Amino acid sequence: MEVTAKLRGAAISAQKVRLVADEVRGKSIERALDILTYSNKKGAVFVKKCLNSAIANAENNNGLDIDTLKVSTIYVDEGITLKRILPRAKGRADRISKRTCHITIKVGE
């Protein structure tokens, strides 16, 4: 049985989070949490939050034993992009893209 958790609208680009997601894909829950705890990437904070939610869902909603769980699927999709304006010299303006992403984690036995 697989249990899903989603984190939508995380304020970080999908490209940066995918680096962290590739590290924990297929690992056991305990190993994945260790990797995320000691990672120095900003995306690790968002992935760890979503993984803890998936663990809680598996334990409380489905009554699964968390010692036997592993990260079966993890993927990161692009969310909405917020467009912002940065004023420059001589009346010009640059566009700034504030990117977001959606993180989906499935844990199973």
Curated annotation (Swiss-Prot):
Keyword Transferase: no
GO cellular component: cytosolic large ribosomal subunit
Origin: domain of life: Bacteria
GO biological process, one term: translation
InterPro entries, A to Z: Ribosomal_uL22, Ribosomal_uL22_bac/chlpt-type, Ribosomal_uL22_bac/org-type, Ribosomal_uL22_CS, Ribosomal_uL22_sf
Keywords noted in UniProt: Ribonucleoprotein, Ribosomal protein, RNA-binding, rRNA-binding
GO molecular function: rRNA binding; structural constituent of ribosome
Subunit structure: Part of the 50S ribosomal subunit.
Matching NCBIfam families: rplV_bact (TIGR01044)
Role description: This protein binds specifically to 23S rRNA; its binding is stimulated by other ribosomal proteins, e.g. L4, L17, and L20. It is important during the early stages of 50S assembly. It makes multiple contacts with different domains of the 23S rRNA in the assembled 50S subunit and ribosome. The globular domain of the protein is located near the polypeptide exit tunnel on the outside of the subunit, while an extended beta-hairpin is found that lines the wall of the exit tunnel in the center of the 70S ribosome.
Listed name of the protein: Large ribosomal subunit protein uL22
Protein species of origin: Psychrobacter arcticus (strain DSM 17307 / VKM B-2377 / 273-4)
